[in-house]
């Protein structure tokens, strides 16, 4: 979505490291108990010289107990040049993105050779994306980057409205470029089908990327061949070949380890929930 490309480059209030020449931008590392960024502010590295030989954007590394991005705030490493976007590494207990918050490592240009989109790695007990919030590593005219969400306790995806979710897309400005790869390991993944919050590794002319998910439970989101008004996991290409989706659900018996209760004259009614399917592939 071009809106998010613009947003990634517009985070000019906050902590910024940028290059306008042929040298690389510096890296940013933050170590703190709680980091809260709101109302359009951001932590940003960028390469903004419109030249194929421009320098690279810097990397961003954040270590925090709590990370909150609210109200079009974000963490962004972006290139508007032939330089590469930097990588983003987040290690936190709780990560919350709401009201358009973004974590993005994008390449936004049509120069040759193309600058590369960066990779995003997030390690957290809980990750929440709510109300059009987004984790993305996308290229306008090259390959999308890779996203790693590892050792996540709960991944909660809400109210995406077709914009929010987890995305690695290639060639989104109608250029050649393949989708990147998304790797997720989580205990629990929750979404609401009607809220259109997606996990997507797409492309326009190139090949769709790869999505590899291992979880104990997945609720409210499932594989589909392309983007729909519902919440989905997809690796489609508009004009090229689709990519690969591999979802492994290690569902456990929720009654395992429970002791039987003594019979009573009146038992409460028990409604058993549905357990997600074992595998979904495309």
Residue ranges of each PLM-predicted region?
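Extracellular and secretory-pathway beta-repeat/beta-biased strand scaffolds
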Residues: 1-282
């Amino acid at each position: 979505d071009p809106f998010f490309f613009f947003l990634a480059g517009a985070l000019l209030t906050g902590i910024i490291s940028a290059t306008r020449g042929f040298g690389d931008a510096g890296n940013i590392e933050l170590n703190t108990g709680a980091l809260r960024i709101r109302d359009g502010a951001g932590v940003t590295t960028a390469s903004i010289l419109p030249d194929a030989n421009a320098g690279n954007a810097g990397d961003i590394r954040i270590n925090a107990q709590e990370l909150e991005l609210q109200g079009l705030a974000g963490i962004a490493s972006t290139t508007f040049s032939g330089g590469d976007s930097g990588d983003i590494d987040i290690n936190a207990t709780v990560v919350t993105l709401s009201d358009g918050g973004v974590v993005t490592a994008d390449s936004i240009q049509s120069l040759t050779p193309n600058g590369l989109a960066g990779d995003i790695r997030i390690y957290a007990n809980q990750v929440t994306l709510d109300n059009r919030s987004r984790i993305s590593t996308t290229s306008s005219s090259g390959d999308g980057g890779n996203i790693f969400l590892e050792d996540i306790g709960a991944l909660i995806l809400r109210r995406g409205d077709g914009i929010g979710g987890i995305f690695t897309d290639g060639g989104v400005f109608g250029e050649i470029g393949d989708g990147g790869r998304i790797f997720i390991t989580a205990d629990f993944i929750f979404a609401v089908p009607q809220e259109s919050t997606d996990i997507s590794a797409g492309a326009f002319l190139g090949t769709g990327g790869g999505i590899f998910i291992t979880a104990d439970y997945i609720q409210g989101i499932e594989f589909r061949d392309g983007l729909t008004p519902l919440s989905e996991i997809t690796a489609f290409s508009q004009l090229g070949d689709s990519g690969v989706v591999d979802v492994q659900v290690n569902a456990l018996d929720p009654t395992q380890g429970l002791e039987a209760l003594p019979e009573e004259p009146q038992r409460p009614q028990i409604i058993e929930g549905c357990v997600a399917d074992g595998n979904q592939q495309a």
